[in-house]
Structures are given as C-alpha cells and as structure tokens.
Amino acid sequence: MQKLLDSHSWNLELKNSLPPFLLGFLALSFQIFLLREFSVHFYGNEITFGFILAAWLLWGGIGSITASKIRFSQARLIQAYYLVIILLPLCLVGLRFSRFLLNILPGEITGIIPMLTSSLLLSLCVSFPLGVLFVFNTHFLKGNLYQVYLMESLGSSTAGLLVYFFLIPFFSNWHGAALAGGIIALLSYFTFGEKRQKLVPLAVLILLIVFCLFDFPSQKIYWKPFQLIQSKDTPYGKLQVLQTEEQISLYNNNLHDFSYPNLASSEESVHFALLKNPEAVNVLLIGGGAAGSLRQILKYPRTQVDYVELDPEIIRISFRHLPESEQEILRNKRIYIFYRDGRAFLLKTQKSYDMIILNLPEPATAQVNRFYTKEFFLKAKEKLTEKGVFSFQVPSAENYISPELQDFLSSLYHTLKQAFPFVKIVPGDTNIFLASSHPLTLEFETLNQKIEELNLRNTYVSPQLLFSRLNPFRVEMIREKATTGKKAINQDLSPISYFYNSVLWSTQFKGIEKTVFAFFSSLRSFWLLDFPLILFIFLLIILWLKGKKSSFFLVPLAVMGFTTIVAEIIVIIAFQTLYGYLYQRIALLLTSFMVGLFLGSYRGKKRKRFDLSQMLVIQAGFLLLILLFQTTLKLNPPEIFFFIFLLAMGFLGGDLFVVSNHLFLKEKKNYGLGYGLDLLGSFGGALAASSLLIPLVGLPHLLTYLFLLNSFCLLFLVGGWRKN
C-alpha cells in the first residue's frame, strides 16, 4: 500500500512539475525561432540581435512583474499556454509580411525605427504572456518558486538540445516553431487533463499544420514580383534562390550573396590578386566560389585551389540551379572543397599558399569581422609563401568617399598594415585590398602586359577598363583617404570595424540612424562605461541609506541578469574568434549555461538555511569567475574552458536566484518581482553589449567593467549584511 502511495505521490509531483518544464521549453524554443526569423527580415547583425533579444527580455520582465495584478486560475494558466502557441505563428506571419506595411521592397534593408518598433511589438505578443506564465506557474505550485525556476531551467536546457540539434538542422524556422508548439500543445493537454476541452488543442494543431503549409507560398508572396524557386533554412541562415530571366541569384537571410552570371564580381575578386603572382600554384579561396570565382582562378594553368565554404547547402544549391558548365567547374580535379569555417581551416592547415583570396561579405557582424582582424591577417601572412598575396574586397564608392566610409576603409587599411608591409587598394565601387610581404604595383602598363602574356580573355578586368579604373589620380585619392582616416585597429577582442560598418550602414537612411551612430561613435569610454558605473554606485548608496531589506535581495538579481547575458555574448564572440563558427559547439555553449542554471537552482533548493552571507559567497564567486576568465582568455584556453565557464556562471546564477528570492519572499509575497528584475538586468546587458560596448570598448575593458560592477554589488551586500 505504501508503494502505491509513493508511486501516486511521485506521479503527482511529476505532473505538477511538467507545466514549468513546458514553460522553459516553450520560452527558449520560441525565442530561438523568433530571433532567427527576425534576423532574416531585419539585417541580421549584432544590432538586430541586441534589439530583439533586449525586447524579449524587457517584455518578459514586465510580464512577470505585472502578473501579480492578474487573478490566477488553472483555466487561465491553460489558456495562456495555448495563447502563446497560437501567437508565435501569427507573429511570424506578420513579420514576413511587414515589408508591405513598411512599404519597402523585398530584400531591402530597413532602418532602426522600424526594427525597434517591430521587435517591441513582436516580443510583447509572445514574451509578455511568458512572463505572466512564470508567476501563474508559481501559483499553480502553491508558491514553490524554486521548483518553478528549477523545472523551467530544465525545460530550457531540453529545448536547447532539441532545437539546435534536431529542429534547426532538418526543418525550416516555421516548421520548427510549429513542431515545438505542437509538442507543447499535446503535452499541455495531457498534463492538465481537461478532457472537456478537446477541441482547443485540436484547433491549435490544425492551425499549426496550416501555418506549415503556408511557409513556402508566403515566401513567394514576399518576393513578388521576383520569382522564388527554392528556399532552404540551414543552421547558418535562410538561403533563397531567385530567378530573373537568365540570371540566378542567391540570397542569404534576405541579403544578396551572389548572382550568376556576374562576370564583373567574379573577375574582380580574382584577377587583381592573381595578376600580382600569376605563377601561383596553391590558392586558398575562402567563400564565394560558386559565383564564378573558381572559373576565373582556373584560367591560370598552374593553380590548385583549396575552396573553403562554411555552409554545404550553398554548394548543393549551386549544383541544382547553376548550368552544367559551372557544375563541371565544382567537380574539377584542381579544386578541393572543404566544408568548414574559413578561419578554423586557416588556423589548422599545415599548407603554405601562394595566394589567399578572402571572398566574404564586408565585416557587418562580429562573426564575419573575425576575418578582418589583425590576428587573422597575421595568420594569413604566416600561411603565405615569400611572394604570396592576400586579397579581399569591400563595397565602396567610385568618386566620393564619405567620412563614414573613410573611417571604415581606414580601419581596415591600418589593420592590414599591422601584418603586411605592402598594401595597395584598387579604387572603384568595390575596393580591392591587396597585401604582401613583397612590393606591389597598380601600374596599368604592368598589369596590361601580364594580361596579354597570359592571353586572358576577360570582360571587366581588361585593358579597356583598367586604364580608367587604375587612373593614378583615383589610386592616390583612395590611398590618401585610407591613410588619413581614423587609425583604429580591428582586433579579435576589440572588433571596431564592424561598428564602423554599422555607422556606414546607418547613412543609407533619412531618419535618426546616422545621428544615433555618430553620437555613440564620438563618445569616450568614460561615458560608455565609467559614467553608468558611477550612477550605479550612487544608486547603491541611496538604497543602502534607506536600509530596506528587500533591496539587498533584489539588486544582486538585476546585476546577475546583466552579468550573465553579457558573459554569454562575450564567450560566443571569443569562442568563434579562437575556434571558428562551429554551429554544434555554439549550441552546446548556450545549452551548458542552461544546464548550469538547472544545477544551481537545484543546489539552492537543497539548502538547509538561507541568509545574506550565502549571497555574499555567491557574489564573490561571480568575481572570481570573471577574473579567471579575463586572465585565461589571454592564454588562448582550450575549448572545454568556455563550456566550464558558462556552466559555472549558470550554476552561480541559479543558486543566487533561489537564495535571494527565498529571502525576499519572507519580506513580501511578490512571486514575479525577482524574476522580472533578473530579466530586466539581462535586457540592459543584451541591448548595450552586442551593439555598442563590445565593438567600441572591446572585450577586455568590458570584462573589467563586469568585474567592477560585481565588486560594488558585493560591497553593497557586505554593507547590508553588517547593517542587518
């Protein structure tokens, strides 16, 4: 009989713990798919990422804080789950067709105001009810906040593994979101056992099926009047193939990747570099080979090409849609294709190259910026032979170089000069940077002679057009602009060039974008780091003087939220810099933090007593962890270090959440306030770190700021401990 009672109790506890588990699963999976789709439609750089993540955290925090004003019932709890499951597909549909409301063309880049407005509206619809659900779950478990947080963390960890390793690699964003929603709808139905409401989950499932079927047709509507012939979501982005008459164009996250045929681009990316060393044998091409660059390289009879492409799906799409002649090029025995991150390939290869051609987009994101840093350029130089040439190209302007463009080009030029003694820039709508340890020339007569000797039949890199493009006046003008602009060096841990690229991006709009970026780029680090820290110290002094016990329990939660989200962003950027963009490992990094939260909250739940001294120890743990990371980062630590760091950071965060909330709830029964402040702290970190602090002040200075922030928080706790 006792066994039956124990079994019944265990089943009841499991059933009661499932709703917060579903909440964590729902929140993280929907957040991932919303972030991915938002990046497709709003220029997926760190600013986009920062806006949508910050808006998500903001509304989640507000939802949690205001939930106390909403009367709880189990019926409302169930309805809230179904509501969120329905709202996400509707938001994704609205996001896809937002271009019609914004009156923009397909693939056109939008400004900050539409981006900010859209992120706030979308997050309000999904994240606000999720914040309310956290408090509802606490009521459902009769005030057991720790069990809710524990199971929510476990649900998030499970969702991270399922979404990153099973849904994203095999399904589109819409299909993945629908599958995640369908799983939650079915589990919600069986968990709450509302047999009288069979029609509700059935209606939800039918809606999700219709949503899935509408995926590709809705994309065709989005791209009208262009003809969309294929769409494929991969772990690295959304690839879409458009056909206009005889031309095939590939778009990656709604940004133009390449078109075929496009002789101008393919010839320029190759010949200016190879004409400097026409006897080159070993050539490394990083990205962009399927667009025609490989065909141009093979015009040089001795070349053997190592072609590195991150996303294998690009090559598969090329085989499917490019003409047979281009498919034969990809199968040529002189070409070896490697599917991996270009930077990771360069770091690990033992081969030396006569030519390295970087054929990637400009450094508009931290991920791409890794290929334009001092450290990468030094590694490229190390892998080149004595007369080897390194080359890359970025969009520019033919006749007028604006101050914003000048700063961007100057940053790249001076960074390149840190590695190579000889640097030349080819003027034009696209600036081609050439660098070598051997003297270079851009004299028309020399290049023209080599074209004739090699019998090259080019259309754009030809004597007729080179005479105008390599006009000495234009060559000198671009050199003068590049050498006299801001001399900021783009480094792995201080990625300034992608901020300059964002400033340049802002000049495309007529709104406040340019003013905002110009303002922040002119600020000194004092206003970005020191001044906010001084304000925080004054706030702590005021709270200490007031002496309210709740302040000593709640302030560390907001600091923890800020610290952990900034630490996650720093770890991902640093990891990509050292080891390349390795999709599965990045996913595991994020999951390891969630696992740490689960373990930390479990540890907190098992504590026998709770007092302020325990918060002191945990806060001191944050300080030691940040100091350890900052010190170790300079030593190029092994991969496992980053996983352990995020696991430990999550563990401390989970433990602190339980202890501080336990102490706070003794003072006041407000289940959502602590969770809300945690999310609002994360909101501040997400908004500031990815878009401003990391590129402008760099990772080392930001880590120092985190250390100081947590130090003053520790002193605040010490003051509270002594006072009470």
Where are these regions (language model features)?
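Alpha-helical transmembrane segments of multi-pass membrane proteins
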Residues: 1-464, 471-724
